[in-house]
Amino acid sequence: MSESPAPGAQHSARGGMSRGEIALLSAVALAELVTRVLYILHHRADSDEPQHLHVAWGWTQGLIQYRDLFDNHAPLFHMVMAPFVGAFGAHASAIVFARWLMLPLAGLATAATYFLGRRLWSRRVGCWAAACIGAVPSFVRVSTEFRADDLWMVGWLFSLLALLGGDLTARGAWLGGLLLGATLATSLKTVLMILALALAAALTLALRPRERWRLVPNRGWRLLGRVLAATAVVPAVIVLVFWRLHSLTALVNCTVRHNLVPGLGLWRSQPYRWLIFPLALSILVPCTRRYLAARTDSGARERRAAFVLTAAIYLALLEGFWPLITAQDFLPSTPMLVLLAVAMVPWGLARIERWLGRSVSPRWGTAVAATAAVIGLNGVNLAEASWRDANQAETQLLTAVLRFTHPDEPIVDLKGETIFRFRPCYLVLEGVTKARLAMGLLADRLPRDVARTRTHFAVPDDGAFPPAVRDFLNDHFVQIGALRVLGADLSRHARNGPDARAFDVIYPERFSVIADGAPARGTLDGVRYRGPRWLLPGYHDYRPGPGERSVDVIWEGAVSRGLVPAATAMSSAAIGSPAAARPARPARIGSRS
């Protein structure tokens, strides 16, 4: 960089790291790598992971995102991951496999943090910032998961590296713009980041001392033009691709119109949050002016100021205006904040040095950073023990799905938890969809879609289902192992006369009645039950036989596949169901999920 070292640079000499410090860094990095590998294997599946996997899998089946599969995320991540998902195939360990794909992205984010620290401050700051981000609990958890935010983070950090990592050149402007465009094609939250970066650059230019107050010379305008032109390249290619696939309108509907809901989330519950933004600016502007005034001819100092302002303004915009805030929204800003925290250590040592009037060993800075990393790693394992397998539920669900269901059979789920099966309805039940249902902006079509598609399976009960949907599923599906099957648990249904239990059938189908793990012996609709029976839509009643307690009405096809709600083993023949299930058929291309 063009200027002399910043205060405290004697504590962070670029090539002055001792062997002991390098060994300590290596030990921290190794511990973080082991923790991350254990998280890949054991971390509880987040509902976003199978949703992203389902969309990527859809591309491998010849389905078009948005047109055939609903998704309210930008498409680049799913398009990039689709070949890997297709190569792996349908396996119960799909989540773990997908997380391994995130490991290189985490490595790239770490490398970008290092290079940003090295170019803006020093090699030591870059090294310890890269080490410390792997010890932030929320960062480790979210960046381990298979989600578009990982690619989003990498694109954003390398965009900053190209634009702020040194004196901006024509090549850097083109590269930075291309990366910004790819980031925008990965997540529409990049709009906040681009706005933050633009405001940060404008404030940095405006707050420079008067002797450097040539606002934007001709070269600066040319560089800005290159950045803007390059930023448009990847989004333009995405638009062209989806236009050719006759899915451009669906893309706009799913990613823009669907997500714009008046009064959504914090917009309704905290309407004065927008005040966070002007309050943040009232603090940032004088602090930046004072920082830039300390040295009147320092390009590196201006780049640092722009970096700090970008991080702060992004957080202010997010907290002030974004309606639904999640942990992953902070993923790209976490390395920036950690980098700033590490950079404050040599600055603090320089202050202490001036106060004491004598030199302070840079080892104190190393000790502070290493201690923070160790405490952070402990926090990672306190938040969720990396050695304890919390991912069994999703694996068991996928095992049951692949074992008991056929590729062309739809399954009711929230957001795509079954990954390799379609939903009976188009929309997924994520936060915005549920808000639209609650506001009456969307009609609840699930019961009609279940009947229309003759859906026989659903995922287990989950409090994330909207109340009406949850009640419908509990009334018409029975939990058997890791899946729910079309039917009714008569122990929770209203009685229809003395000892009779009523249940509802939503479309014509053959049902078996199982009592305490064996064929029932009571009467169904007034006729003695002797085997599977074809039932028409509407209400029916069953009167238990002598001694029958736990009674379930179950779709007969599930019984033939071995899905029986009892510990007592029971053959298909004993229940009177067909000998074998039909062979699996490939999913129909173009069907809606």
Question: For the regions a protein language model found, what residue spans apply to each?
Answer:
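Transmembrane-helix motifs of polytopic, lipid-linked glycan transferases
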Residues: 26, 30, 100-120, 135, ...
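Membrane-interface alpha helices of multi-pass inner-membrane proteins
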Residues: 129, 142, 162, 172-188, ...
